[in-house]
Amino acid sequence: EVNPDINVNVETYAGGELGTTFNNSASAYEDPTPATENAGMTDKFKYGEYFFERSYTQNSKPFNGLGPLYIRNSCMNCHPGYGHGKRVDRYRADDWGNGYLLVVTDGKDNYLSSLTGMPQTKAVAPFKAPIDEDKIKIDWLPYTDEWGNKFPDGETYSLIYPEVTIPQDARSEPLEATYNQVVTPVNYSDVVVLLESTIGIYGTGLLDAIPDDSLKAEYARQEKAGVKLNPAIFANGEWTSLYKGLTGKQYPKRYTYALTRSSIQDGPGANAIWNITNVTRSDRRYHYMTDT
């Protein structure tokens, strides 16, 4: 085996027996899992790395087809070292490590349908991006929590949160939301802009491994404890919506910022690598764009 047994208790494996690497160097988070290597799938892992690490362009093969609108030109831009994005003070798609994605809603948690769920701020000529990222403003403001930013032993801590502003002259698309299949104008004063940040690639398989019944039990436990849950996902001890997978089978939602996906094969990365760059493929002959 590529990764033979070593004298370590299994319960200490952070990623379980199939997913723990014992490389403690700076490249540890970029490793294939032992299960991947022991199954003889290293080549497939490397092919995946090619897609993940390369920058896409408009014309240079084989990593061509960027745009016409896009969010980033590579996965690594948002996931430096396969990790999560870093905190930044401005929104620039080309800034290395900026893992932020914009979330633009009508103020009632409904995404604007005139923009893509992950709004695009880049375009290839002669196209124009729907949002001028140079005009996006990010302010980090101090925040005081319900405990007064203090631990029980008296130690204090500081918190900050982002306030994002996109001025009216920064957009080239109308402000619209769709309610019951009816496109409706949204007032600029009602628009709310939030930031979604990328997560680390490592560990996402562990989320996929959580049994569906265990996920439901945790939702029920939190609901019973009085935690405010999204009624569009779970209410009164039951799922109120499920995700229909590629096979037609329904699963609880567990992936993406908006909980729109259920399986890692049809979830983060599997779709984002195409949506982020807007590259098409032989079985995906469409772009990530709105009708607007």
Placement of each model-derived feature along the sequence:
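Extracytoplasmic redox metalloprotein regions
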Residues: F22-N24, A28-F45, E53-T292
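Bacterial Sec-dependent N-terminal signal peptides
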Residues: E1-G16
